[in-house]
Amino acid sequence: MGDAMPARLQLERLLAEDPARLAARMRAPAAARLLAECRAAAAQPARPVLRSLHHFACTGGTLFAKSIAALPCVRLLSEADPFSPLGYQGAFAPRDLISLAKAGSSPPGQAVLARIFQAGLAALAAETRFEGGDLVLRDHSHSHFCTTDACGSGLPQRPSMKELLQADYHLLSLVTVRHPLDSWLSLLRQSWVHFTPGTLEEYARRYHLFLDHYADTPILQYEAFTAAPEAGMAQICQVLELSGSAGFQERMAAQSLSGDSGRSGTSIAARPRRAVPETVAAELQTAPSYGRLCARLGYDPDPQGAAWPGAAVAGPASPDAG
């Protein structure tokens, strides 16, 4: 090591020179220029990889998250959103800097909250890479697209998780979906309708905004995953560039995550569809955005039809035509 360090320093100094000067000093100018160009490229490290998972509430997101968390070397953060108006609102949050800041005597704006979130995530991402693991972030998309902040014809006036992360990371993202009628019925049952008007049409309109925002992102259907879990996990691992999917179903029972409110039991299997109340059935006649949403995601809008047409995995959803 004693002799290697001076030689390394000499090489670094040599490659730090201007390519033209370096070429003049070496017998092979082309090689010298190539070395200098390689050094210049190496001085700009590539953005680290970060995986992200996006879905609406009551679409099987926790099942997907638990399955991914069961993979070896995965560290999963469940339901993250630094701007969420939901959840614990008390002043006592000794471990949560964002909650402390919002409950403090001079609450900061979105820009500061974003920097707090990004700094904490950067530390955790770096530690995960150092340990040889893969960090997966489960976005709480419901907080963005299904709260009163999202009123109006466009997107909410706040950054999305994608916008918060894409400058610092090479994002590998996946959107997961479920039949919109089934997820809407579950949302009603959980009393999680946090927007106005609280109608199926408004829900579908917001769903379109979500899909528009994550256009070109691969989509996996909940129904496809529950029908063929091993094939679905192989697809997830391909999209997110994760390894070691074998045996994930046996390991996922040990995972405990937030958002685990709808599904009971540990087996991955399709569940019976809920009955459609008369009030919701009446809404189906006046919800054109719902019909377009079903067509966009490859579902039959008829509540008497099959929940899933049988296609294994859907590609990116085309923009809403309505």
Tell me the role of every PLM-derived stretch.
Residues 1-130, 138-140, 249-307, ...:
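PAPS-dependent sulfotransferase catalytic core
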Residues 91-97, 234-235, 261-268:
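Short, surface-exposed amphipathic charged segments that create phosphate/polyanion-binding patches used
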Residues 305-322:
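C-terminal non-catalytic accessory extensions
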Residues 61, 110-118, 157-158, 200-204, ...:
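A structural signal for well-ordered alpha-helical scaffolds and beta->alpha junctions
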Residues 79, 247-250:
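A short, aromatic/hydrophobic, helix- or strand-capping loop or linear motif
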Residues 72, 240-241, 297:
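A broad structural signal for alpha-helix termini and local helix breaks/kinks
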Residues 134, 139-247:
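PAPS-dependent sulfotransferase catalytic domain
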